[in-house]
Amino acid sequence: NGAPQPFVRF
């Protein structure tokens, strides 16, 4: 998986 994943910080 070379595509960056949307990461959400809380």
UniProtKB/Swiss-Prot annotation:
<comment type="function">
    <text>Myoactive.</text>
</comment>
<keyword id="KW-0027">Amidation</keyword>
<dbReference type="GO" id="GO:0007218">
    <property type="term" value="P:neuropeptide signaling pathway"/>
</dbReference>
<feature type="modified residue" description="Phenylalanine amide">
    <location>
        <position position="10"/>
    </location>
</feature>
<dbReference type="GO" id="GO:0005576">
    <property type="term" value="C:extracellular region"/>
</dbReference>
<keyword id="KW-0527">Neuropeptide</keyword>
<comment type="similarity">
    <text>Belongs to the FARP (FMRFamide related peptide) family.</text>
</comment>
<protein>
    <recommendedName>
        <fullName>FMRFamide-like neuropeptide PF6</fullName>
    </recommendedName>
</protein>
<keyword id="KW-0964">Secreted</keyword>
